[in-house]
């Protein structure tokens, strides 16, 4: 009886204590957005197919995936795409479909690593924010900044950075990227060395298949 009281007392004490333990979140360490030159949106599409799709084609996909979007007029979607900084309806809806999938899969953290550009990061963050009202009780996907740099030796380097280092990465990309498809004339070793020396986290992508 005394032992039971001690156990009960210990249990009650643990219940009232503040939980200082960590929490696990589902995380995507490497994801591309419509900003990547080879983005395809759906698994069954390739890049060329996606490029040929019209605003209306992507709208039909969105209707099947995002709750309530079929209630919106296409004119309203077009207006929103411009209002929130997207290039067109197709891009706006593509980001919305991606953000919607992150909510459905209960992804807590995601590292955006588009090829040779960081322009897609803010667009994905905005789409996640805009869909919050549809999933008020779901885990909110936190976006980490990243970029996948295509190097001269055909290897790819992923660089992960916080908002304070955005300007550093932007300047490097501006000065060293030939174009978003070709990447940089620098070797992977030079890229790794530069960003590592600056205190940024970086690693070789697809190293087991390169």
Residues of each region from the PLM?
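Short, acidic/polar
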Residues: 43-45, 87-103, 210
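Divalent metal-dependent hydrolysis catalytic cores, especially in the metallo-beta-lactamase
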Residues: 99-116, 201-203
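Hydrophobic positions within alpha-helical membrane elements
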Residues: 35-37, 119, 153
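Histidine-centered catalytic micro-motifs
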Residues: 26-38, 115
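Divalent metal-binding segments
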Residues: 80-82, 90, 116, 176-185
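Acidic/histidine-rich helix-loop elements
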Residues: 33-91
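Extended substrate/RNA-proximal surfaces in nucleic-acid metabolism proteins
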Residues: 2-17, 24, 121-210
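Short, conserved beta-strand segments within well-ordered enzyme catalytic domains
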Residues: 28, 110-111, 144
């Amino acid at each position: 009886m005394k032992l039971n009281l001690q156990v009960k007392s210990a249990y009650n004490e643990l219940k009232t204590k503040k939980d200082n333990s960590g929490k696990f979140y589902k995380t995507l360490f490497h994801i591309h957005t419509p900003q990547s030159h080879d983005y395809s949106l759906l698994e069954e599409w390739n890049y060329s197919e996606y490029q040929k799709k019209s605003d209306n084609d992507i709208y039909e996909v969105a209707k099947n995936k995002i709750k309530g979007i079929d209630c919106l007029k296409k004119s309203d979607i077009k207006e929103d795409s411009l209002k929130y900084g997207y290039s067109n309806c197709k891009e706006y809806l593509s980001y919305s479909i991606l953000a919607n999938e992150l909510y459905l899969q209960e992804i807590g953290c995601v590292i955006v690593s588009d090829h040779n550009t960081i322009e897609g990061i803010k667009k994905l963050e905005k789409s996640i924010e805009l869909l919050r009202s549809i999933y008020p009780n779901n885990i909110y996907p936190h976006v980490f900044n990243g970029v996948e740099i295509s190097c001269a030796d055909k290897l790819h380097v992923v660089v992960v950075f916080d908002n304070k280092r955005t300007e550093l990465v932007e300047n490097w990309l501006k000065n060293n990227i030939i174009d978003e498809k070709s990447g940089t004339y620098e070797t992977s070793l030079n890229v790794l060395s530069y960003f590592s020396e600056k205190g940024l986290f970086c690693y070789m992508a697809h190293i087991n298949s390169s």
